Protein backbone atom coordinates (compact mmCIF):
# COMPACT_ATOMS: atom_id res chain seq x y z
CA UNK A 1 0.00 0.00 0.00
CA UNK A 2 2.84 2.37 0.85
CA UNK A 3 4.48 1.69 -2.54
CA UNK A 4 1.28 2.38 -4.53
CA UNK A 5 1.52 -0.81 -6.59
CA UNK A 6 -0.97 -1.33 -9.43
CA UNK A 7 -3.29 -3.51 -7.35
CA UNK A 8 -3.45 -5.95 -4.48
CA UNK A 9 -5.12 -9.29 -5.18
CA UNK A 10 -7.50 -10.25 -2.40
CA UNK A 11 -7.79 -13.94 -1.44
CA UNK A 12 -10.50 -13.79 1.25
CA UNK A 13 -13.20 -11.56 2.66
CA UNK A 14 -11.18 -11.24 5.87
CA UNK A 15 -8.20 -10.02 3.86
CA UNK A 16 -10.42 -7.47 2.12
CA UNK A 17 -11.42 -6.04 5.50
CA UNK A 18 -7.81 -5.93 6.69
CA UNK A 19 -6.51 -4.29 3.51
CA UNK A 20 -9.29 -1.70 3.60
CA UNK A 21 -8.41 -0.90 7.23
CA UNK A 22 -4.71 -0.44 6.41
CA UNK A 23 -5.59 1.81 3.46
CA UNK A 24 -7.92 3.82 5.70
CA UNK A 25 -5.16 4.26 8.28
CA UNK A 26 -2.87 5.56 5.51
CA UNK A 27 -5.62 7.79 4.11
CA UNK A 28 -5.43 6.07 0.70
CA UNK A 29 -7.82 4.49 -1.75
CA UNK A 30 -6.14 1.53 -3.42
CA UNK A 31 -6.91 -0.67 -6.40
CA UNK A 32 -7.70 -4.30 -5.70
CA UNK A 33 -8.46 -7.45 -7.62
CA UNK A 34 -10.47 -10.37 -6.28
CA UNK A 35 -9.16 -13.90 -6.73
CA UNK A 36 -12.16 -16.15 -7.18
CA UNK A 37 -12.31 -19.87 -6.54
CA UNK A 38 -14.43 -21.08 -9.47
CA UNK A 39 -14.70 -24.70 -8.25
CA UNK A 40 -13.04 -26.16 -11.34
CA UNK A 41 -11.03 -29.35 -11.27
CA UNK A 42 -7.87 -28.76 -13.28
CA UNK A 43 -7.56 -32.52 -13.86
CA UNK A 44 -3.98 -32.33 -12.65
CA UNK A 45 -1.85 -33.57 -9.76
CA UNK A 46 -3.75 -32.93 -6.52
CA UNK A 47 -0.83 -31.06 -4.92
CA UNK A 48 -0.85 -28.45 -7.70
CA UNK A 49 -4.62 -28.13 -8.01
CA UNK A 50 -5.79 -24.72 -6.81
CA UNK A 51 -9.31 -24.12 -8.14
CA UNK A 52 -11.60 -26.67 -6.48
CA UNK A 53 -14.05 -25.65 -3.78
CA UNK A 54 -11.94 -27.42 -1.15
CA UNK A 55 -8.69 -25.69 -2.20
CA UNK A 56 -7.37 -22.87 -0.04
CA UNK A 57 -7.07 -20.25 -2.77
CA UNK A 58 -9.54 -17.53 -3.69
CA UNK A 59 -13.04 -16.58 -2.61
CA UNK A 60 -15.72 -19.20 -3.18
CA UNK A 61 -18.15 -17.91 -5.81
CA UNK A 62 -20.98 -19.07 -3.54
CA UNK A 63 -19.94 -16.21 -1.21
CA UNK A 64 -20.30 -13.39 -3.73
CA UNK A 65 -23.27 -11.82 -1.89
CA UNK A 66 -21.23 -11.66 1.31
CA UNK A 67 -18.30 -10.25 -0.67
CA UNK A 68 -20.48 -7.52 -2.20
CA UNK A 69 -21.77 -6.51 1.25
CA UNK A 70 -18.21 -6.05 2.50
CA UNK A 71 -17.12 -4.27 -0.70
CA UNK A 72 -20.02 -1.82 -0.30
CA UNK A 73 -18.69 -0.62 3.07
CA UNK A 74 -15.00 -0.80 2.13
CA UNK A 75 -14.54 2.80 1.02
CA UNK A 76 -10.74 2.70 0.76
CA UNK A 77 -10.54 0.07 -1.96
CA UNK A 78 -11.41 0.28 -5.63
CA UNK A 79 -12.20 -3.05 -7.29
CA UNK A 80 -10.79 -3.10 -10.83
CA UNK A 81 -10.39 -6.79 -11.66
CA UNK A 82 -11.02 -10.43 -10.93
CA UNK A 83 -8.77 -13.45 -11.33
CA UNK A 84 -8.55 -17.19 -10.85
CA UNK A 85 -5.97 -19.93 -11.16
CA UNK A 86 -7.04 -23.57 -11.03
CA UNK A 87 -3.68 -25.31 -11.04
CA UNK A 88 -0.59 -26.25 -12.99
CA UNK A 89 0.19 -28.90 -15.56
CA UNK A 90 -3.22 -28.75 -17.26
CA UNK A 91 -3.39 -30.70 -20.52
CA UNK A 92 -7.17 -30.73 -21.10
CA UNK A 93 -8.69 -28.01 -23.31
CA UNK A 94 -12.08 -28.53 -21.66
CA UNK A 95 -10.64 -27.26 -18.37
CA UNK A 96 -9.65 -23.99 -20.03
CA UNK A 97 -13.02 -23.71 -21.78
CA UNK A 98 -14.74 -24.05 -18.39
CA UNK A 99 -12.41 -21.46 -16.81
CA UNK A 100 -13.15 -18.97 -19.59
CA UNK A 101 -16.92 -19.49 -19.40
CA UNK A 102 -17.06 -19.19 -15.62
CA UNK A 103 -14.82 -16.14 -15.47
CA UNK A 104 -16.85 -14.39 -18.16
CA UNK A 105 -20.05 -15.13 -16.22
CA UNK A 106 -18.49 -13.91 -12.98
CA UNK A 107 -17.19 -10.73 -14.62
CA UNK A 108 -20.71 -10.05 -15.88
CA UNK A 109 -22.10 -10.40 -12.34
CA UNK A 110 -19.64 -7.77 -11.10
CA UNK A 111 -20.40 -5.47 -14.06
CA UNK A 112 -24.17 -5.82 -13.61
CA UNK A 113 -23.86 -4.76 -9.97
CA UNK A 114 -21.93 -1.68 -11.04
CA UNK A 115 -18.26 -2.53 -10.54
CA UNK A 116 -15.98 -1.15 -13.24
CA UNK A 117 -14.06 -4.32 -14.02
CA UNK A 118 -11.07 -3.31 -16.13
CA UNK A 119 -9.32 -6.66 -16.38
CA UNK A 120 -9.95 -10.37 -15.98
CA UNK A 121 -6.96 -12.62 -15.23
CA UNK A 122 -7.67 -16.12 -16.52
CA UNK A 123 -4.81 -17.71 -14.61
CA UNK A 124 -2.55 -20.13 -16.37
CA UNK A 125 -1.50 -23.68 -15.77
CA UNK A 126 -0.61 -24.72 -19.31
CA UNK A 127 1.04 -28.10 -19.02
CA UNK A 128 4.63 -28.66 -20.09
CA UNK A 129 6.08 -32.00 -21.08
CA UNK A 130 8.36 -33.58 -18.50
CA UNK A 131 7.83 -37.03 -20.03
CA UNK A 132 6.99 -38.43 -23.45
CA UNK A 133 3.41 -39.34 -22.49
CA UNK A 134 2.49 -35.70 -21.76
CA UNK A 135 1.14 -34.12 -24.95
CA UNK A 136 1.22 -30.33 -24.98
CA UNK A 137 -1.94 -28.37 -25.62
CA UNK A 138 -1.86 -26.29 -28.75
CA UNK A 139 -1.76 -22.55 -28.10
CA UNK A 140 -4.03 -22.25 -31.12
CA UNK A 141 -6.70 -24.24 -29.25
CA UNK A 142 -6.38 -21.92 -26.24
CA UNK A 143 -6.60 -18.85 -28.49
CA UNK A 144 -9.69 -20.23 -30.24
CA UNK A 145 -11.45 -20.85 -26.92
CA UNK A 146 -10.63 -17.33 -25.73
CA UNK A 147 -11.85 -15.80 -28.99
CA UNK A 148 -15.03 -17.87 -28.89
CA UNK A 149 -15.85 -16.94 -25.30
CA UNK A 150 -14.78 -13.31 -24.98
CA UNK A 151 -16.45 -11.31 -27.73
CA UNK A 152 -16.84 -7.53 -27.29
CA UNK A 153 -16.14 -7.55 -23.56
CA UNK A 154 -15.38 -4.22 -21.81
CA UNK A 155 -12.25 -5.44 -20.02
CA UNK A 156 -8.76 -6.62 -20.86
CA UNK A 157 -7.76 -10.25 -20.48
CA UNK A 158 -4.53 -11.58 -19.07
CA UNK A 159 -3.11 -15.07 -18.97
CA UNK A 160 -0.24 -16.46 -16.90
CA UNK A 161 1.94 -18.74 -19.05
CA UNK A 162 4.37 -19.43 -16.20
CA UNK A 163 6.57 -22.46 -16.69
CA UNK A 164 5.20 -22.96 -20.22
CA UNK A 165 7.67 -20.26 -21.29
CA UNK A 166 10.74 -21.49 -19.44
CA UNK A 167 10.39 -25.17 -18.44
CA UNK A 168 12.32 -26.42 -21.45
CA UNK A 169 14.87 -23.61 -21.36
CA UNK A 170 17.28 -25.56 -19.20
CA UNK A 171 18.11 -28.92 -17.68
CA UNK A 172 19.16 -30.05 -14.22
CA UNK A 173 22.43 -31.98 -14.17
CA UNK A 174 23.21 -33.77 -10.94
CA UNK A 175 25.52 -36.47 -9.63
CA UNK A 176 24.37 -39.74 -8.07
CA UNK A 177 26.26 -39.95 -4.79
CA UNK A 178 24.96 -43.29 -3.59
CA UNK A 179 22.09 -45.73 -3.87
CA UNK A 180 19.98 -46.32 -0.77
CA UNK A 181 17.60 -49.26 -0.35
CA UNK A 182 14.55 -48.91 1.89
CA UNK A 183 11.90 -51.60 1.95
CA UNK A 184 13.15 -53.18 -1.24
CA UNK A 185 13.04 -49.89 -3.16
CA UNK A 186 16.23 -48.33 -4.51
CA UNK A 187 16.57 -44.56 -4.07
CA UNK A 188 19.19 -42.58 -5.94
CA UNK A 189 20.79 -40.04 -3.61
CA UNK A 190 22.04 -37.03 -5.56
CA UNK A 191 23.74 -33.73 -4.86
CA UNK A 192 20.55 -31.88 -5.89
CA UNK A 193 17.30 -31.64 -4.00
CA UNK A 194 13.84 -30.10 -3.89
CA UNK A 195 15.44 -26.70 -3.39
CA UNK A 196 17.09 -27.08 -6.81
CA UNK A 197 14.03 -28.07 -8.88
CA UNK A 198 10.84 -28.01 -6.84
CA UNK A 199 8.26 -30.39 -8.26
CA UNK A 200 5.53 -32.40 -6.53
Residues of each region from the PLM?
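Active-site-proximal beta-alpha core segment in soluble small-molecule metabolic enzymes
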Residues: 1-119
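C-terminal active-site-proximal or functional interface alpha/beta core segments in diverse enzymes
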Residues: 86-200
